[in-house]
Design a protein with these regions (language model features):
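N-terminal leader/signal peptides at the extreme start of proteins
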Residues: 1-9, 172
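Short, contiguous hydrophobic alpha-helices characteristic of membrane insertion segments
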Residues: 6-27
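N-terminal helix-rich module
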Residues: 13, 25-55, 59, 63-182
Length: 182
C-alpha cells in the first residue's frame, strides 16, 4: 500500500480560505498602524528639531531659527512648504532669514511621503528662539501659541497631528480629535 504524500484539494482550499479571511481583517489595521506611525515620526522630527533650536539658542546665547527650506541653504517664505524640509540656523539678528554671518546648523530632508503637508494656523514661515529660549516673531494670537498641523491626503482625523509653540518657547504635540487641534 502506498502512503499518501502532499495535500488534498480540500485541505489546500481550507488553508487559502483562512488566509484570505485573516488578510481581510489584518491588512486594513496594518495600514492604519503604518500611517499613524509615519505621521507620528514626521511630527516628532519637527518637534525635536524645534526643541534642538531652542536649547541651541540658550546654549549659544543668540537667536536660532527653524524655517522651511527646499535647498538646505535658504528659507522659503511660505507656511505651506514645511514638508519639503527645513533648516536650523544661528540667526544673529533674529529676522528669520539666513544672512551673511549666519550659520546653518542642521538640514532636515523632505518627507518620504509626498501626500503629507504641514500647515501653520497663523501662516508662520519661521520659528525663532531668542537666547532666553522664548519664541519671537510669532504672530499674535488670542491663545498665546501658534499651531503647526500635519495633514495627510486624504485628510483623516486619525492621522492629523499638531505642534503648538507658545511665546515662552514651550512646545507640545497633540493628536487631532475632529481633524483640527484645539
Amino acid at each position: 500500500m502506498r502512503t499518501a504524500c502532499g495535500y488534498s484539494v480540500v485541505e489546500l482550499m481550507s488553508v487559502v480560505s483562512i488566509a484570505g479571511i485573516l488578510m481581510t481583517v489584518g491588512v486594513p489595521s496594518f495600514r492604519y498602524v503604518t500611517n499613524s506611525n509615519r505621521v507620528t515620526a514626521e511630527v516628532n522630527s519637527l518637534y525635536f528639531d524645534l526643541e534642538l533650536a531652542r536649547s541651541t539658542a540658550v546654549a549659544m546665547g543668540l537667536p536660532v531659527t527653524v524655517c522651511p527650506s527646499t535647498d538646505g541653504q535658504t528659507c522659503v517664505p511660505s507656511a505651506e512648504i514645511w514638508q519639503s524640509g527645513w533648516i536650523i540656523f544661528s540667526d544673529s539678528n533674529g529676522n528669520g532669514v539666513v544672512d551673511s554671518g549666519d550659520e546653518v546648523l542642521m538640514v532636515r530632508a523632505a518627507f518620504t511621503s509626498s501626500t503629507d503637508t504641514f500647515l501653520s494656523s497663523q501662516g508662520v514661515s519661521a520659528v525663532t528662539f531668542n537666547r532666553e529660549g522664548f519664541a519671537i516673531n510669532l504672530p499674535s494670537s488670542s491663545t498665546g501659541f501658534t499651531t503647526i498641523t500635519l495633514h495627510t491626503q486624504p485628510q483623516s482625523p486619525a492621522w492629523t497631528r499638531c505642534i503648538q509653540v507658545s511665546t515662552i518657547g514651550m512646545l507640545t504635540t497633540e493628536h487631532a480629535q475632529q481633524g483640527s487641534c484645539t
